[in-house]
């Protein structure tokens, strides 16, 4: 099992798919990384040589922000919005949808489970 950016990459999957197990790498970036290293995306991770795995690791470390660094940057950006006290920061602080979605009904994922209202009957 190859280890890239602190993540164990599954060996039985294609390189293009296996790279997506790394937080911050999606379909487009995975394809781009394969092109930079000149590896066919259809090859299996188990078929890669140690040198190719090392090349992939170097490209990711050099050109892409992934895993802990990416998570940390997102958290810092959200904290900055909350400290500024602007509208988006307030929505984050209150645990409500940030991007303009309706909250009269729905928004349960962001707001959590519905709180029962005393005395209300159907």
Swiss-Prot record:
Q: Does the keyword Magnesium apply?
A: no
GO CC annotation? cytosol; small ribosomal subunit
Q: Which InterPro entries match?
A: Rbsml_uS13_C, Ribosomal_uS13, Ribosomal_uS13-like_H2TH, Ribosomal_uS13_bac-type, Ribosomal_uS13_CS
Quote one Gene Ontology molecular function term: tRNA binding
Keyword DNA-binding appears in the UniProt entry: no
Q: Which SUPFAM superfamilies match?
A: S13-like H2TH domain (SSF46946)
- Which GO BP terms apply? translation
Q: Where is this region: Disordered?
A: 92-122
Q: Which keywords does UniProt give here?
A: Ribonucleoprotein, Ribosomal protein, RNA-binding, rRNA-binding, tRNA-binding
What NCBIfam families does the entry give? uS13_bact
Assembly, per entry:
Part of the 30S ribosomal subunit. Forms a loose heterodimer with protein S19. Forms two bridges to the 50S subunit in the 70S ribosome.
Described purpose of this protein according to its UniProt entry: Located at the top of the head of the 30S subunit, it contacts several helices of the 16S rRNA. In the 70S ribosome it contacts the 23S rRNA (bridge B1a) and protein L5 of the 50S subunit (bridge B1b), connecting the 2 subunits; these bridges are implicated in subunit movement. Contacts the tRNAs in the A and P-sites.
Task: Describe the family membership recorded for this protein in Swiss-Prot or TrEMBL.
Answer: Belongs to the universal ribosomal protein uS13 family.
Q: Write down what this protein is called.
A: Small ribosomal subunit protein uS13
| Species this protein is from | Maricaulis maris (strain MCS10)
Q: What is the lineage of its organism?
A: Bacteria, Pseudomonadati, Pseudomonadota, Alphaproteobacteria, Maricaulales
UniProt lists the gene as rpsM
């Amino acid at each position: 099992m190859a280890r890239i950016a602190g993540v164990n990459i599954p060996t039985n999957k294609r390189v293009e798919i296996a790279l997506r197990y790394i937080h911050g790498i999606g379909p487009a970036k995975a394809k781009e990384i394969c092109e930079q290293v000149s590896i066919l995306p259809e090859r299996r991770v188990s078929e890669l040589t140690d040198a190719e795995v090392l090349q992939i690791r170097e490209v990711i470390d050099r050109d892409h922000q992934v895993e802990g660094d990416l998570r940390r940057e997102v958290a810092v950006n959200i904290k900055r919005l909350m400290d500024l006290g602007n509208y988006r920061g307030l929505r984050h602080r209150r645990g409500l949808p940030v991007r303009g979605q309706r909250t009269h009904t729905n928004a349960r994922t962001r707001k959590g489970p519905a709180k029962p209202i005393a005395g209300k009957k159907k």
